[in-house]
Amino acid sequence: MIENIKKDAQERMGKCVDATKNQMAKVRTGRAHPSLLDSIQVSYYGTMTPLNQVANVGVEDSRTLSVTVFDRSAIQAVEKAIMSSDLGLNPMSAGATLRIPLPALTEERRKDFIKVVRNEAENGRIAIRNVRRDAISEVKKLEKAKACTEDDVRRSEEEVQKFTDAHIKKVDEILAAKEIELMEV
């Protein structure tokens, strides 16, 4: 019973780390990466659709993304969605393909992005700590139901804390790597 709780906590903490990593991938650095456009929704035949379902996003070079739209009639909608996003991008139309040059980041914009990334990391840490709290409360419920001993509870709390520390360390490593990536010119 306690093993299941610990295993579940570890899986959920891993998912928190993955979610944090995915959120940080959306933050624009100086380099072109297809995941920059993952959060963009396109109005396609009256329905909000993720960009990757109406177009293929690729990298032309380190500062240019190319978006090949599957349906030529959706080019204007895709272009409008990219321009109205908060990424500050201006696509250039070339037939069924949109080329998106990525402007160099200013120092001020880099610092703003670092604040965003740090906030995402803190949200990840909070989620991991919430999983820890849930796991420990589940173990304490077992103790109240006389399904385990006080020593088992203490041992479980220590193990869950080790999982928590390890996963928070992963989030911190991801944050450090992203900050370095953002500060590269």
Curated annotation (Swiss-Prot):
It comes from the Bacteria. InterPro entries: Ribosome_recyc_fac, Ribosome_recyc_fac_dom, RRF_sf. Signal peptide: none annotated. GO terms for molecular function: ribosomal large subunit binding. Gene3D superfamilies: 3.30.1360.40, Ribosome-recycling factor. Pfam families: RRF. GO terms for biological process: cytoplasmic translational termination. It is found in: Cytoplasm. GO terms for cellular component: cytosol. Keywords: Cytoplasm, Protein biosynthesis. Belongs to the RRF family. Responsible for the release of ribosomes from messenger RNA at the termination of protein biosynthesis. May increase the efficiency of translation by recycling ribosomes from one round of translation to another. This is Ribosome-recycling factor. The gene is frr.
